Amino acid sequence: MSVRRFLVWILALTVGAAPVMADRLKDLSRIKGVRNNQLVGYGLVVGLDGTGDKAPFTNQTFRNMMNQFGITLPDGVNPKLANVAAVTVSATLPAFAKAGQELDITVSSIGNADSLRGGTLLMTPLKGADGQVYAMAQGSLVVGGFGAQGQDGSRITVNVPSVGRIPNGATIEREVESPFNRGDTITFNLLRSDFTTARRVVEAINGRLGPDMAYAHDATSISVRAPRDPSQRVSFLSILENIEVDPAQEAARVVINSRTGTIVVGQNVKVSPAAITHGNLTVTIQENPEVVQPNPLAQGDTAVQQNTQIAVTEDPARMFQFGPATTLNEIVQAVNQVGAAPGDVMAVLEALKQAGALRAELIVI
């Protein structure tokens, strides 16, 4: 690609049309090949105030470390390592990270350590999925939680004291080669696959760069012809990713989390005409311990027996009706008027789906 044509592209992109209420391409997609990589390692945290673990693999790791320093422990000696904990160290290696840069790391106990507060992580290699070492970690931990325990076994714990972080605790030793500068095209992968959004992305790019500059492979991938020169490609991409696109509306979905009672209803959810009634059956069980004394002249011991009372109450069933093409606002108003609990709403939505009246995808997580 010539420099003249590249400058014409830059001028066309910077002039552009008037801004609209839309999302930037960088917010809707990710560039193919530009990704993070996960790193993990195994190491020791020392300097704990008696809150270390007593796992056998901690002693083995400690022996191996001593051997590396030329110190051999006699056979049969089992050191009491109350101040040492075996941990896993994890980090995320960003795209284009260079050797010498630093990473934040997370340190997590894998034994029965009570707390990592006040500990120091010894030098730990961090490896990638290919088994190669990409960073070295070491430093003092920052732990947000704490715990305390009494001699009678009672204890209190705030947050999670067995996990800590070390800001800038790892130094990158090896870089990951990126395919960013290879080939004649740059491919964007949409975060949410949608044929309509993919078509609009292609139209927005071609409208700014010219016809046939961008094309869609499927509902996820869109390729754009780009200059080969790395400096031109960076400038080209910095403007390309700021092109605004009006994404398609999401498909109608209702997401239910049965564990937390959370219900999320999408904007395009509608309900066909239906009448619903749902009653509540409440069972209450009360356990009242009572002390039973033996007769004055009888031989026996004082005992405690349970006095159980069971009560069943059924609230009157409420009926409400959905008209044709009922919208999200109408659904929310109907549910609020009858005072339905999240569990009741889940049951109603599942019944509507089975009856074919819920015109949306029902997802239970």
UniProtKB/Swiss-Prot annotation:
> What's the domain of life for this entry?
Bacteria
The processes (GO biological process) annotated in the record are: bacterial-type flagellum-dependent cell motility
Localization in the cell: Periplasm; Bacterial flagellum basal body
Q: Which GO terms describe its molecular function?
A: structural molecule activity
Which cellular components does GO assign to this protein?
bacterial-type flagellum basal body, distal rod, P ring; outer membrane-bounded periplasmic space
Q: Name one Pfam family in it.
A: FlgI
Q: Report whether Signal shows up as a keyword of the record.
A: yes
Which key words tag this protein in UniProt? Bacterial flagellum, Periplasm, Signal
Which region is the signal sequence? 1-22
Q: Summarize the subunit comment.
A: The basal body constitutes a major portion of the flagellar organelle and consists of four rings (L,P,S, and M) mounted on a central rod.
Q: What does this protein do?
A: Assembles around the rod to form the L-ring and probably protects the motor/basal body from shearing forces during rotation.
Q: Which family does it belong to?
A: Belongs to the FlgI family.
Query: What name goes with this protein?
Result: Flagellar P-ring protein
> From which source organism is this entry?
Marinobacter nauticus (strain ATCC 700491 / DSM 11845 / VT8)
